[in-house]
Amino acid sequence: MKVKICGITDMETAKRACEYGADALGFVFAESKRKITPGLAKEIIQELPANVLKIGVFVNESVEVIQKITENCGLTHVQLHGDEDNHQIRRLNIPSIKALGVTSEIDMKNAQAYKTDYILFDSPKERFYGGNGKKFSWELLAHMSKKLREKTILAGGLNALNIEEAIRTVRPYMVDVSSGVETEGKKDVEKIKQFIIKAKECSK
């Protein structure tokens, strides 16, 4: 099971997450309490292992700005958390992830229309897109096609206590966590370690 730790804002957390086995790290460039500057993201990314995916999170940003930040920071993928469509995705010409809030099985069916490398299923948006710590009904994704499952990233309210049930129900390609590995709004490296251990155990 692949694991993504999202909302990275400092070097120490990034390095520790990689040491514990994270397969991907997320850097939020949209409005969020976890927002990071491109300059700091670049410093962190330069120190990370080559095999770890570096994913930039954007919300309704222009194609030009996304391309510039991707190139300058050394991102491997972009995660689109807003109202982006296939036209914008094609113009980006960057490996991409489309994030969708899930309220019914219709959302799962609509996801198949997006021409992205991965689909991230998350809780419905609130004030900020993503990272709100709330789960949705995983059963809504239990019967997706094998083709969609192989490109599915599961997010939304995940933590070390519920990750086993989430993986067993959805069987995604990757799981994504942010607030579920935080203590008082800050990344907690011990929680990151335990989350990764639990998630990896599920795929043995």
Swiss-Prot record:
GO terms for molecular function: phosphoribosylanthranilate isomerase activity. The keyword Amino-acid biosynthesis applies. Its EC number is 5.3.1.24. It catalyses: N-(5-phospho-beta-D-ribosyl)anthranilate = 1-(2-carboxyphenylamino)-1-deoxy-D-ribulose 5-phosphate. Pathway: Amino-acid biosynthesis; L-tryptophan biosynthesis; L-tryptophan from chorismate: step 3/5. InterPro entries: Aldolase_TIM, PRAI_dom, RibuloseP-bd_barrel, TrpF_fam. GO terms for biological process: L-tryptophan biosynthetic process. Keywords: Amino-acid biosynthesis, Aromatic amino acid biosynthesis, Isomerase, Tryptophan biosynthesis. It comes from the Bacteria. The keyword Amino-acid biosynthesis applies. PANTHER family: N-(5'-PHOSPHORIBOSYL)ANTHRANILATE ISOMERASE. Belongs to the TrpF family. HAMAP family: PRAI. This is N-(5'-phosphoribosyl)anthranilate isomerase.
